[in-house]
Amino acid sequence: MSAFDIAGSGPTSRVYFSQRLRLHYVDWGNPTAPPLLLVHGGRDHCRNWDWLASALRGDWHILAPDLRGHGDSQWSPDGNYSTAAYVYDLAQLIHQQELAPVTIIAHSLGGNIAIRHAGVYPDKVRKLVAIEGLGPSPKRMAAR
């Protein structure tokens, strides 16, 4: 894909379903390239990655999901925003779009989800970059 083919065009909004939730993601095209997931942090949305996706889309098939309860994704009616639920949602996107093994760049909450996803599904992740994705220490969590 040449820079001319992609200049000035934005991503396509798409949806997938996980645990009966309608979840949103954007697809930056270039489906024959290696897959790259960009996972945002808490209180954020998928379009926060536009600057990076624009720069990398010539070499990657980039998808950026809105986590449940974020952006254009549905809120959980039962209030389930557990890490396990987020990990499952990410696994569903990777499975339904046949992205594995996938490279993931993730920030904050997204980094925490991606690290846990890689631990549960190591064969589904080619490479992982987690930016500030560790979260609170076990000692701090125990004090809560």
Name what the model sees in each region:
Residues M1-L36, R57-W60, E98-A100, G135:
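Alpha/beta-hydrolase fold catalytic core
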Residues Q74-P77, K139-A143:
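Short aromatic-enriched loop/helix-cap "lid" or pocket-rim segments at secondary-structure transitions
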Residues L21-W75:
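Conserved HGGG/HGGXW glycine-rich cap/lid loop of the alpha/beta-hydrolase fold
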Residues A100-M141:
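Conserved hydrolase catalytic core segment
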